[in-house]
UniProtKB/Swiss-Prot annotation:
Pfam families in alphabetical order: B3
Cellular compartment(s): Nucleus
Primary location class: nucleus
Protein name per the record: Putative B3 domain-containing protein Os06g0632500
SMART domains (UniProt xref): B3
Keywords: DNA-binding, Nucleus, Repeat, Transcription, Transcription regulation
InterPro entries to which the protein is assigned, alphabetical: B3_DNA-bd (IPR003340), DNA-bd_pseudobarrel_sf (IPR015300), REM_fam (IPR039218)
GO cellular component: nucleus
Cited CDD domains: B3_DNA
Domain of life the protein comes from: Eukaryota
Higher taxonomy: Eukaryota, Viridiplantae, Streptophyta, Embryophyta, Tracheophyta
Length: 393
């Protein structure tokens, strides 16, 4: 199911999945990340100290997992070799959060001179420094970080602690599928396999790595959305977030990767009158969303000529009979379908009639307890301009 997406603007990030003892006192960061983090207007250390050390230093602010702001020195080598590191103040921050050898950190640039910090424990899971009260929703969804090793290229073990905390109730079969949504814009179905006591990403995993040019040394950051849906961020071997400027999104039904056959790969919503004098097929339903606060992905739609169709409808599709309420108020979408394609929270969605045409309609997608729905002026405009009528399917 092709998904149309524009530029993916993500905040720069740096990942260090396995800290050494030296990293607890001085954390090396890539020069490109340091260049974006460095605030030229921020107050640095004294000029005399700079001259004595032979290195330029700037003060940056690091927001810890509990919200406390730490002042840390960012030092860069004057030799222009790209060497940079977090120095003064970093060791105090690390000690305050109990960081040790084998822990991991991810820094995200919030703006010039300011970065936020996430910490991962030796079990590779997002560290929780406080337990939310019962009934309270935490901002951070469960995450785990993975530095790819040679043995992970054919099958990858999900951290045991993560399985125990988040997957035990959901993962009930020895063979069950997970959906991985990656920054490249593809939805991949990968088989989960139980090999006591481990849970492995197996069938479909190697094609996923190959399609995204991932190998030993790459870093993956998984975020669990629920219902066996994971989003993943990809980092280069130097720890910098891999940036994708364009995306063509697909929903794969097997381990062979995206299918080239539109009849099998595209989700279809049939729209036709009761007497079936005319049929319109809306294909390629896909999801595009903004960055963090509404992390979703675009819905692209393709209308085929008015002729009879004999095709295989993908599992990830649905058919709706249009009513006056669905046209003028809202169109409901099954909760299982939303979960299946990664629509998990309110976002803006782009509807397209054809991937080859420029026309598109921006509509609002929202969630209720057991279903999702599309509504608002954008949806009504889409119905009007595409002549959707009552009792069409």
């Amino acid at each position: 199911m092709p998904l149309s997406a524009g530029s993916l603007r993500r905040r720069p990030k740096f990942a260090a999945p396995l800290l050494s003892p030296a990293c607890l006192h001085r954390l090396s960061v890539p020069g490109e990340f340091a260049a974006r983090l460095d605030d030229d207007d921020a107050a640095g250390v004294g000029e005399e100290e700079e001259e004595e050390s032979g290195r330029r230093a700037a003060a940056v602010l690091v927001v810890g997992p509990l919200g406390k702001v730490w002042r840390v020195e960012l030092r860069r080598s004057p030799a222009g070799d790209g060497e940079a590191w977090l120095g003064g103040g970093w060791s105090e921050l690390a000690a305050a959060h109990g960081l040790g050898e084998g822990w991991g950190v991810v820094l995200r640039l919030e703006r010039r001179g300011v970065a936020s910090l996430r910490v991962f424990d030796p079990g590779f899971c997002l560290a929780r420094f406080c337990t939310p009260h019962a009934g309270m929703r935490t901002k951070d969804r469960p995450r785990f970080i993975k530095l790819l090793q040679q043995e992970d290229l054919e099958k990858m073990k999900i951290p045991e602690k993560f399985v125990q905390q988040h997957l035990t109730e959901t993962y009930t079969n020895n063979h069950q599928n997970a959906i991985i949504v990656c920054p490249l814009g593809k939805f991949w179905r990968v088989e989960l396999q139980r090999e006591q006591p481990d849970v492995l990403l197996r069938d479909g995993w190697a094609p996923f790595l190959a399609a995204h040019d991932l190998s030993e040394g790459n870093i993956l950051l998984f975020r669990y959305e629920g219902n066996m849906v994971f989003t993943v961020e990809v980092f280069l071997q130097n720890g910098c977030l891999k940036e994708y400027k364009t995306a063509a999104l697909y929903l794969t039904d097997g381990t062979e990767g995206p299918s080239n056959a539109p009849q099998q790969s595209a989700a279809k919503v049939g729209v036709s009158p009761v007497k079936r004098k005319r049929t319109r097929r809306i294909e390629g339903t896909c999801l595009e969303g903004p960055n963090r606060k509404s992390r979703a992905s675009p819905i692209s739609v393709k209308v085929e000529p008015h002729k009879k169709h004999v095709s295989i409808v993908s599992q990830n599709s649905f058919t709706k009979e249009m009513t006056a309420y669905s046209i003028h108020s809202l169109l409901s979408v099954r909760g299982t379908f939303c979960s299946q394609i990664g629509l998990l929270e309110a976002c803006a969605i782009t509807l397209k009639i054809s991937m080859k045409k420029k026309g598109s309609w921006r509509v609002a997608f929202k969630t209720a307890n057991t279903y999702g729905y599309i509504n608002g002026p954008g949806w009504r405009k889409f119905c009007l301009e595409n002549e959707l009528e009552v009792q069409r399917r």
